[in-house]
Each structure stands twice: as structure tokens, then as C-alpha cells.
A protein has these predicted regions:
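Intrinsically disordered, low-complexity, mixed-charge
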Residues: 1-119
Length: 119
């Protein structure tokens, strides 16, 4: 295994542990929404997409996350609004990630979406 691959594996294992140990509040199901969120800052090469995907899955949210050519990350997240708010707050709380700007816009929900994926 190359040194960089080893580093990524250690980082990814840490990301998974962080998500698994995070304490989730009791959520009250509220409005079902879909949001397109664009993040800028130190959000690439830090496990951001993996962490967002794992936490979104744990929160029973659907959608996708992808890197942007300008160094940002974009996600569409669908589910109950309180869970999406928690996800965004969780991502802002991570020390190795520095979100400088976050644009959060509503978009139309998608029927039949069943998972959250990294694209």
C-alpha cells in the first residue's frame, strides 16, 4: 500500500468512528424538504464527502454529495428539515474541516430516492 493510500485509509477509518460515536438528538419529524448546499473552505481532501455521506445515511437522509472543480463541495440532501439542520451543524463542528461559506437553497424533492451517495 502506498503511503498516501495508507494515510487516506487511516483518515477514512477516523471519519467513520467520528460518525458512529456522534450522539444524535431525539428528532421530531417536521417538514420533508430537499436542499442544495454548496460548501467552500477547507472541504476537499479532508474526508468531507465521506463524513457527510455517512452521517446523512445515519440520519436516514437521501441525496448525493460531490466535489466541485472550484475546490468546493456540493450536496443535495432530502429528508426531515430537523435532521438536515443537525447534519449541517455537525459538519460545521468538525475540527479538520473549515467551512468558510455555506449556501443553502431549497429544491424540489425527488420521488423514489432511497440512498445517499458520493458521486
Amino acid at each position: 500500500m502506498k503511503p498516501m493510500d495508507k494515510f487516506k485509509q487511516v483518515r477514512d477509518d477516523d471519519v467513520i468512528r467520528q460518525v458512529e460515536k456522534a450522539k444524535l438528538p431525539d428528532f421530531e419529524d417536521d417538514y420533508f424538504v430537499r436542499r442544495r448546499v454548496t460548501f467552500h473552505g477547507r472541504v476537499q481532501h479532508v474526508g468531507f464527502r465521506l463524513e457527510l455521506e455517512r452521517m446523512a445515511t445515519r440520519l436516514e437522509l437521501t441525496g448525493w454529495v460531490k466535489n466541485l472543480e472550484d475546490g468546493g463541495v456540493q450536496a443535495e440532501v432530502q429528508g426531515y428539515e430537523s435532521r438536515i439542520r443537525f447534519l449541517l451543524k455537525f459538519m460545521r463542528s468538525l475540527k479538520r474541516i473549515k467551512i468558510e461559506t455555506m449556501e443553502n437553497k431549497p429544491c424540489s424533492p425527488k420521488q423514489n430516492e432511497t440512498e445517499f451517495k458520493i458521486i
